[in-house]
Amino acid sequence: MSSPAVARTSPGGSREMAPAPQGRGRFWEVGGGSGHRLERAAAESERWELLLRRGELLALGGHLKGALEAFAAALRRGAPARPECLGALVDCLVFNYRLRHGLGWSAAPVAGADGGAGGLLRCLGCRGFLSEPVTVPCGHSYCRRCLRRELRARCRLCRDRLPPATASATDAEGTAPRPPPLAAAIAASDFRTSVVLNHLAEKWFPGQRERARAAGRLGELLHQGRYREALAAACEALRAEPSDLIVKIYRAESYAGLQEFKAAIEDLNAVLFQLPDWPEVYFRKGKVLCDAGFLGDALQLFLQCLALDEDFAPAKLQVQKILCDLLLPENLKEGLKESSWSSLPCTKNRPFDFHSVMEESQSLNEPSPKQSEEIPEVTSEPVKGSLNRAQSAQSINSTEMPAREDCLKRVSSEPVLSVQEKGVLLKRKLSLLEQDVIVNEDGRNKLKKQGETPNEVCMFSLAYGDIPEELIDVSDFECSLCMRLFFEPVTTPCGHSFCKNCLERCLDHAPYCPLCKESLKEYLADRRYCVTQLLEELIVKYLPDELSERKKIYDEETAELSHLTKNVPIFVCTMAYPTVPCPLHVFEPRYRLMIRRSIQTGTKQFGMCVSDTQNSFADYGCMLQIRNVHFLPDGRSVVDTVGGKRFRVLKRGMKDGYCTADIEYLEDVKVENEDEIKNLRELHDLVYSQACSWFQNLRDRFRSQILQHFGSMPEREENLQAAPNGPAWCWWLLAVLPVDPRYQLSVLSMKSLKERLTKIQHILTYFSRDQSK
C-alpha cells in the first residue's frame, strides 16, 4: 500500500507533493477508510430501514407482492432478521390466503348457541370441556390450559386482550408489550379458577372433570419432556375413553416429541376429521411438519389456522419465523420445498410458493409500485437444511379418512391439506350461502338449512349430557354477600364471584376480596366489573323463575332510588347555587355509593346542603347535576357538578350511611305589575354595575383564582323572570363573595328576586367601602 502524499511549499513559492511519513500515512489511511465505511454503513442502514417501512406500509395496504419484495430487499441490504417485525406481512399473507379460497371472515360465535349445558360449559379457546375455568377481565371464561399455553392473544368473542402467561412475547418493536394491569394481575395469580364455575363443573359432570384432570397431568409430562411416560398415559386414557380428543392431541404431541411424525399426523388427522374447524389442531399439525423439515407444508397449515382464527398467537409467531428464514438472501434463491406431500392422490394441486402468491395477489389487489431491486425467482428446490430427515412427507401422511371424497369435488384446497381438512374450506364456502355443514354420527357431511335442528350435532366439544333436575340447586348461585341469587355476577382475579353492586360496595371500604382478603387494587383501578357471561347464562337457562323474582326486587330498589322528591340523597358538605359549578372530591365510602347510585339510576342528581348542628343538615339546599366523574385508581373520584333547582327539606332520613330527604322545589314569585317590573329592572341594572365594578377592582391574584374556579361572570339577562331561580349572575356573585354561609343560606331560601338583589347590594356596598380604604 502506497503512502499518501502531503503538499508542501518550496522556497520558490511553488507547491510540490512529498510522501508523508510512513507511520502517519497508515493512520490517515485507516482513518479515512473507516470514515468512508461508516458513511456507507449509515447510508445502507437508512436504506434498509426505509425498505422495511415500505414493506410494512405495502402489507398494511394489502399489496403482498410489493411487501415481500421490499422485505427481501431490506434483508439483502443488511437489515437484521427479526421475525417480530413481520406482523403486518403475516396479516397480509393471511388475508390473501382467505381471498384465494373464498373464505369469509369467521363471525364471533355466540356463547351457548348450541344449547345444553354441554355447550355452555365449554372452553371458548380449545372448545373442550371447561376444566378449571378462569374468567378473564372481559367476563368470558376459558380453561386454564388455554391461558397457560397462550393459544390466543385476544378473546374469541369480544377480542379483548387475554392475560399473558409469560412476559416473553415481544411486539413489533422487539420490546415486551405491557399488558393491562388487570390482565397482568390475573396472570400473576397463576390464573385462579372461578370457584363457582369450577364447583358446578365438578358437580354436574364428574366424569368429564376427572378426564380433564388426567389430561392436565399429561400436559405436565409433556412440558417436562417425559414423552415416553406421556405416551403410555395417553394410550391408557384413550383405551378408557376413545372419543377424548384432547387426550388424542396430547398423544400426537408425545409422538412428535419421540420423532414419530407419522403416528402424530394420524392422530391429528383423526381429530380434524371430527372437528374440521379447530385452529389448534392445524397448528399442532404444522408444528409436526415443521419439526420434520417440511416448511412449505407447515406454513400452509399455520396459514389455515390463522384463517380460522386470526388471533391464534403461536401460529402467527411460527409464520413470522418461517417468513424471516425464507426471505434471507441465502434461502430466497432456493425457495420452498415442493414436497412429495403435494403429489399425494388426494391433494393433486400446485405447490405453495411465494412466486405464485405474488402473481395472484397482483390480480386480487392493485399493482404495487415498482421496486428498485428485483426479488430472485422462487424455484422448487428444497430449502437448505430442511431435507435432512429420514421420513418423507408421503410416508408421514399416508393415513386417509373414509367417505369424504364426494363432498370435496366442489372446492379447491391447498395441497398440504389432507382429505378431512378439505371439509373446512367446503364448510366456509357454504356458510357464505347461509348453510352449515354438520357431522353426523356416521361421519358423512350433510347440508343443514338454518332453522333446522338435527337430533345430534357434533360441535367443538363432546355432548356432556343434560343436567338432572335434582342437581340444580339455587344455593349454588347465591352471592355470599347479600345471600340472594346472583344479579349481574362478576368474578374477581382471585376467582370469587359476587353481585356487581355487592362487590362495588365492599370495594368502597377496602380494596380486598371480601372472602379471601386478596388485594384487588388492580381490579378496582380497572373499574370494568364485566359480568361473568357463563354464570349469567346458566342462571337464565336453569333458574328463570328465581331470576325473574330477583330482577323484580332490583327494579323496585332502583325505582325507589330514582325519586327526585322522596328519599333524595343529600351530600352534606358545602353551599351550592343554581347554574354555578361545584367540583367535589369524593372519598368517603357512603358518598362513593351515593354517587354511583345516582349514575346507575340515570338521574345523575343529588342534593347539597351545609351541615347543621341541630338537624344534621340545613333546611334549604340546591340540587347538583353530575356532568362528569373522573375515578382515581384507589376508588376515590373527582365529580364535576353544576347547581340546579333549589329545594326545602320536608323530612329527613338515612339510607346505607348517607342522608336522604323528602323535598319540595323553590321558584321565584313572579312580579306582574308593570311599575314593579320597571323598578325591579332599575335595581337589577344598578346592582349588576356595582358587582362588575367590585370584581374589576379585586387584586389580579384573587380575580384569576375566582375565574379559574367558578368561570367568568354571566352576562345580564333581558328577561329577569324567565328562569325559575332568577338571573344566573346573582348566584355566581353570591358564590364568590366572602360572606358567612348562614347569610348565603338565607339568600338561597328567598323566593323574591327583589329581596335577593337588595341583600346582594348591601353586601357589595360593604365590600366596596373596604376596597376604597
From Swiss-Prot:
Boundaries of every Lon N-terminal domain copy: 558-768
Keyword ATP-binding on entry: no
Ranges for the TPR repeats: 48-81, 212-244, 246-278, 279-312
A GO molecular function held by the record: zinc ion binding
A Pfam family reported for this protein in Swiss-Prot or TrEMBL: LON_substr_bdg
Region: Disordered, residue numbers: 1-29, 359-388
Name assigned to this protein: LON peptidase N-terminal domain and RING finger protein 1
Gene name linked to the record: LONRF1
